[in-house]
């Protein structure tokens, strides 16, 4: 590595091959700090609707994809990122498709294994599955390029105890954490007031054995809500929205 004018560097390193790119500017690769590569194939299907409607529809459509679909979609998303100059991504995935895809494409990435459960009785089981996946994914990737972490599901799909469990495990195992707390005012209203389409959706989908109503208002902001449950106790926490 060296710095200088083209003429100076050519004199210093006469045996090195040189390339002339004309007026092009050479930049380091861009970094995208929040992706869901496995959902790339769903782009453009749902648009011009409120956030709550959009995200819930996207989750329902994503559930129709199988493992092969998720992998192909993650490859597509990775290729589109590379074509835009993005060489590093921070990706949240439940399937692990982006872990395999970024490894195969030679990208740098931090892959966060999503973990969530609305029912308190399912939290420990969900964490156990996530921990097993995390250890397995670590063995499958080049650790110099790909780092594995954890991400609690969005607040409308996650029991608050999950935040504490993730933070405790992350601190113990020194893994990064990604949080999604307030994607839109509707999500903020869900946390503070117990209202918005998210509360209705939680009852309609009957996730687990959650009592009705499945969510009680907290009277605080999503950030303070997560703070109260210890979500920021680990050493490497990224909040994407």
Task: Specify the residue positions occupied by each region the protein language model found.
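Histidine-rich, glycine-flanked metal-binding segment
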Residues: 1-27
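Divalent metal-coordination and catalytic microenvironments
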Residues: 23, 34, 85, 102, ...
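Alpha-helical scaffold segments that flank or form the walls of functional sites
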Residues: 25, 43-107, 128-143
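Histidine-centered catalytic micro-motifs
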Residues: 29-40, 176-185
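Structural preference for beta-strand elements that scaffold enzyme active sites
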Residues: 31, 87-88, 108-110, 145-151, ...
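Active-site beta-loop-alpha junctions enriched in small/polar residues
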Residues: 36, 94, 114-118, 151-155, ...
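Active-site gating loops and adjacent loop-to-helix segments of metal-dependent hydrolytic enzymes
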Residues: 41-72, 110-113, 185-234
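Active-site glycine- and acidic-residue-rich loops that bind
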Residues: 151-167
């Amino acid at each position: 590595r060296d710095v200088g004018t083209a003429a100076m560097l050519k004199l210093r390193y006469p045996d090195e091959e040189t390339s002339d790119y004309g007026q092009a500017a050479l930049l380091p690769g861009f970094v995208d700090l929040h992706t869901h590569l496995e959902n790339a194939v769903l782009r453009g299907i749902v648009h011009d609707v409120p956030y709550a409607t959009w995200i819930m529809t996207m989750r329902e459509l994503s559930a129709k994809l199988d493992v092969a679909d998720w992998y192909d979609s993650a490859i597509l998303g990775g290729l589109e990122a590379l074509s835009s100059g993005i060489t590093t991504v921070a990706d949240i995935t439940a399937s692990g498709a982006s872990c395999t895809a970024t490894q195969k494409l030679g990208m740098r990435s931090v892959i966060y294994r999503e973990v969530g459960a609305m029912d308190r009785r399912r939290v420990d089981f969900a964490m156990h599955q996530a921990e097993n996946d995390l250890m397995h994914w670590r063995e499958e990737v080049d650790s110099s390029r790909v780092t594995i972490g954890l991400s609690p599901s969005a607040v409308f799909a996650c029991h608050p105890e999950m935040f504490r469990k993730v933070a405790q495990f992350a601190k113990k195992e020194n893994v990064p954490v990604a949080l999604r707390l307030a994607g839109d005012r509707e999500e903020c209203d869900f946390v503070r007031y117990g209202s918005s389409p998210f509360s209705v959706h939680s009852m309609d989908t009957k996730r687990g054995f959650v009592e009705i109503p499945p969510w009680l208002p907290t009277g605080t902001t999503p950030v303070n809500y997560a703070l109260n449950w210890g979500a920021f106790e680990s050493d490497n926490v990224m909040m994407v929205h």
